[in-house]
From Swiss-Prot:
One of its GO terms (molecular function) is cobalt-precorrin-5B C1-methyltransferase activity. It catalyses: Co-precorrin-5B + S-adenosyl-L-methionine = Co-precorrin-6A + S-adenosyl-L-homocysteine. It comes from Listeria welshimeri serovar 6b (strain ATCC 35897 / DSM 20650 / CCUG 15529 / CIP 8149 / NCTC 11857 / SLCC 5334 / V8). The keyword GTP-binding does not apply. Its EC number is 2.1.1.195. This is Cobalt-precorrin-5B C(1)-methyltransferase. Belongs to the CbiD family. Signal peptide: none annotated. Pathway: Cofactor biosynthesis; adenosylcobalamin biosynthesis; cob(II)yrinate a,c-diamide from sirohydrochlorin (anaerobic route): step 6/10. Keywords: Cobalamin biosynthesis, Methyltransferase, S-adenosyl-L-methionine, Transferase. Pfam families: CbiD (PF01888).
Length: 373
């Protein structure tokens, strides 16, 4: 696929999703059955309306059955499924119904709350529609078929995805909102995080714990002793995930994270990638200065490369109450961020250090334990 975007001055090639792969392979199968000739490429319309020419391999066919595969090409976006083969088997039937299912390497939903029903193959609605339309268009209205999508590497590749968090077990998902993979785009990642959040809400949860990643997750479970069932990753997308909790009408949010990550939010930085915004030292220096810290401490903190290193200086100087001040600012900024949209969301914050453990909370820790057990 020769289509490109530019990001930070560099040129990146776009690719296509597992859903587009499955639609192309399914269409190739139908064409081989109907023409009794091998098909090496097919033209498909993606879920987003883009027309692509997709190469096909591993072709086999007989009078009523065919198999074909398409290799996932994520362009310059090397994700967990890049380069793997998506196989499709199509068998004509005596009915007019077209039935789609997943086989080996395609995950199955085991929990409510996502866009796939419990027990069904993890083929999301948009690619499912696209696959069925591709087959129906080639097959016509008066024939039926059974379609099986499978991926021999799927179970292993799924270990590098968020599927287990979503209750999808046994393989990958067939995905694709637009059918096109856009390199350097965070949209797919954000969508996965939203899906997990939506699943929790659909299960009846009204309060949620947002963590930036594994450190936060581990701290919540093993230091605070809170249930893992309430935890969802927000990664670097703090603002986006806060907006999502509001959209889904969660009543309470507890943000738990390493101080070096969450300190940015106190200054209104809601996307916390270091490449986008790294003002940790500046924020610490400003808050220490407001507390009357001596110039010598401010100068030393400014030189620190990490908040862990700064923490040692802050502790020695007796200014650890700066953590409480900043935690309250994280809470205030976050609530202000959601202020002009309903419903309102109550937000609390817990920050910690790898070396020093719990640093600050916006509510007494025993009260938080009562609320979140």
């Amino acid at each position: 696929m020769e289509d490109f975007i530019y990001y930070n001055g560099k040129k990146y090639r776009k690719g296509y999703t597992t859903g587009t792969c499955a639609a192309a392979a399914a269409k190739a199968c139908v064409e081989m059955i109907l023409t009794q000739e091998e098909v090496s490429a097919v033209q498909v319309t993606t879920t987003g309306g883009t027309i692509l020419e997709i190469p096909v391999a591993h072709q086999q066919f007989s009078k009523k059955r065919a198999t074909a595969a398409v290799q996932k090409d994520g362009g310059d976006d090397i994700d967990a499924t890049h380069g793997m083969w998506i196989f499709v088997d199509v068998e004509l039937t005596n009915s007019t119904e077209v039935v789609l299912d997943g086989g080996v390497g395609i995950g199955r939903a085991t929990q409510k709350g996502i866009s796939v029903a419990v027990g069904e193959a993890a083929i999301n609605p948009a690619p499912r529609k696209n696959i069925l339309e591709a087959v129906r268009k080639s097959l016509g209205e008066h024939r039926g078929a059974n379609i099986l999508v499978y991926a021999p590497e799927g179970e292993e590749r799924a270990k590098r995805t968020m599927n287990s968090n979503l209750g999808i077990i046994g393989g990958i998902s067939i995905l694709g909102t637009t059918g096109i993979v856009t390199p350097m785009s965070d949209e797919g990642w954000k969508k996965s995080l939203s899906m997990e959040l939506e699943m929790k809400r659909n299960q009846g949860l009204e309060q949620i714990i947002l963590v930036p990643g594994n450190y936060g997750d581990d701290f919540v479970q093993h230091t605070l002793g809170f249930s893992s069932n309430n935890i969802v990753s927000m990664s670097n997308f703090v603002g986006y995930m806060l907006k999502e909790t509001q959209r889904l009408a969660f009543k309470k949010v507890l943000m738990v994270g390493h101080f070096g990550k969450l300190v940015k939010v106190s200054a209104g930085i809601f996307t916390t990638y270091s490449k986008d915004a790294d003002a940790r030292a500046e924020i610490l220096v400003a808050n220490l200065a407001l507390l009357g810290a001596p110039l010598s401490l401010l100068q030393e903190v400014e030189k620190c490369n990490t908040t862990e290193a700064a923490g040692e200086l802050i502790e020695e100087a007796g200014y650890t109450h700066v953590y409480e001040v900043i935690a309250q600012k994280i809470k205030a900024r976050s609530e202000r961020f959601l202020k002009f949209t309903k419903p309102s969301v109550e937000i609390d914050v817990v920050t910690f250090s790898t070396e020093r453990g719990l640093l600050a909370t916006t509510k007494d820790i025993d009260v938080l334990r009562e609320e979140w057990q």
